[in-house]
Curated annotation (Swiss-Prot):
Signal peptide positions (record): 1-19
Propeptide positions: 20-50
Protein name in UniProt: U7-theraphotoxin-Hhn1a 2
Family: Belongs to the neurotoxin 10 (Hwtx-1) family. 13 (Hntx-13) subfamily.
Location in or out of the cell: Secreted
InterPro entries reported for this sequence: Huwentoxin-1 (IPR011696)
Domain notes: The presence of a 'disulfide through disulfide knot' structurally defines this protein as a knottin.
Pfam families given in the database record: Toxin_12 (PF07740)
Disulfide bond entries: C51-C65, C58-C70, C64-C81
Protein keywords: Disulfide bond, Ion channel impairing toxin, Knottin, Secreted, Signal, Toxin
GO cellular component: extracellular region
Amino acid sequence: MKIAIFTVVLALAVFAVLSFGWEANEKALSEEFTELIHEKEAASETEARECRYFWGECHDHMPCCDWLVCRYKWPITYNICVWNRTFPEK
């Protein structure tokens, strides 16, 4: 009987140690994934366009391309670039 109880307690201790290790590994992977996302986001910001394309979000500091105009369109809660009914000259 004592051996069975000792075995159960030992097994629970092993499971506790293993789960702690898995949790630490999972947290490390989560942090690594978050850093990777931030790096990709920073890389895409450096490749920002000079103008916003069709249906792109626009503001004073983010102008639309020449053949588009910045308008508020309901139900969208921000301004978007829409066609101004002209064609760009090439």
